[in-house]
C-alpha cells in the first residue's frame, strides 16, 4: 500500500512539474535546451575520455570546462531574463544577453590560453 501511495505522489509531482513547465515562456525553454546541450556535450567528452583515454589532457579539461562554464553562464542568463524573478526586474534582457556574451568571450579566451 505504501508503494502505491508513493507512486501516486510521484506521478502527481511529475504532472504538476510538467504543467508548470508548460507555462514557461519560450525564450526560457530555449535557454534550458542550450544548458541541456552543453551538459550532455560535457558528459559525452567524459565518457569518451573514459573509453579512449585522455592523452592530450589539457584539451580534455578545456573542452569539459568550456561546456560546464557555458552551462553555468546560461543558467545565470536564464535567472536574469526570467520575468518572475523580482531581483532582476530593472535589468533589461538586452543587458543580460550582453553580459552573457561578454562573459562567454572571457571564458573562452581563458580556455584558449589554457590550451597553450
Swiss-Prot record:
Membrane topology annotation: Multi-pass membrane protein
Stretches of the chain found on the membrane's Cytoplasmic side: 1-32, 78-95
GO CC annotations on file: oligosaccharyltransferase complex
Key word Flavoprotein present: no
Lumenal topology ranges: 54-56
One GO term (biological process): protein N-linked glycosylation
Compartment(s) of residence: Endoplasmic reticulum membrane
Signal peptide coordinates: none
Keywords noted in UniProt: Apoptosis, Endoplasmic reticulum, Membrane, Transmembrane, Transmembrane helix
Function noted in UniProt: Subunit of the oligosaccharyl transferase (OST) complex that catalyzes the initial transfer of a defined glycan (Glc(3)Man(9)GlcNAc(2) in eukaryotes) from the lipid carrier dolichol-pyrophosphate to an asparagine residue within an Asn-X-Ser/Thr consensus motif in nascent polypeptide chains, the first step in protein N-glycosylation. N-glycosylation occurs cotranslationally and the complex associates with the Sec61 complex at the channel-forming translocon complex that mediates protein translocation across the endoplasmic reticulum (ER). All subunits are required for a maximal enzyme activity.
Subunit text: Component of the oligosaccharyltransferase (OST) complex.
Official protein name in the record: Dolichyl-diphosphooligosaccharide--protein glycosyltransferase subunit DAD1
Taxonomic source organism: Solanum lycopersicum (Tomato)
Amino acid at each position: 500500500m505504501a508503494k502505491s501511495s508513493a507512486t501516486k505522489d510521484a506521478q502527481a509531482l511529475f504532472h504538476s512539474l510538467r504543467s508548470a513547465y508548460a507555462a514557461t515562456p519560450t525564450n526560457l525553454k530555449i535557454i534550458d535546451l542550450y544548458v541541456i546541450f552543453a551538459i550532455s556535450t560535457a558528459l559525452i567528452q567524459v565518457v569518451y575520455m573514459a573509453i579512449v583515454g585522455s592523452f592530450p589532457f589539457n584539451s580534455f579539461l578545456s573542452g569539459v570546462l568550456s561546456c560546464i562554464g557555458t552551462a553555468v553562464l546560461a543558467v545565470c542568463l536564464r535567472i536574469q531574463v526570467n520575468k518572475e524573478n523580482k531581483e532582476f526586474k530593472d535589468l533589461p534582457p538586452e543587458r543580460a544577453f550582453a553580459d552573457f556574451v561578454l562573459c562567454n568571450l572571457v571564458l573562452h579566451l581563458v580556455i584558449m590560453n589554457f590550451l597553450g
